[in-house]
Structure formats: C-alpha cells, structure tokens
Swiss-Prot record:
Role played: Major yolk protein. This iron protein may play a role in the detoxification of free iron after a blood meal.
Compartments (UniProt record): Secreted
Signal sequence, renumbered to the chain: none
UniProt source species: Theromyzon tessulatum (Duck leech)
Keyword terms, alphabetized: Iron, Metal-binding, Oxygen transport, Secreted, Transport
Family the UniProt entry places it in: Belongs to the hemerythrin family.
The UniProt record lists the keyword Secreted: yes
Main location as per UniProt: secreted
GO cellular component, as recorded: extracellular region
Domain of life: Eukaryota
GO terms assigned for molecular function: metal ion binding; oxygen carrier activity
Coiled coil: none
Protein name per UniProt: Ovohemerythrin
Length: 18
C-alpha cells in the first residue's frame, strides 16, 4: 500500500493495515 514511510507503522495505520 502506498503510505509514506513515517506513517507506515504509525499505530493508527497499523489498526487498518495489520
């Protein structure tokens, strides 16, 4: 998925992308 690196493993994104 095309998420910028600083946000890729942000907790809020991990909720959706794990």
């Amino acid at each position: 998925y095309d998420i910028p690196e600083p946000f890729r493993w942000d907790e809020s994104f991990k909720v959706f992308y794990e």
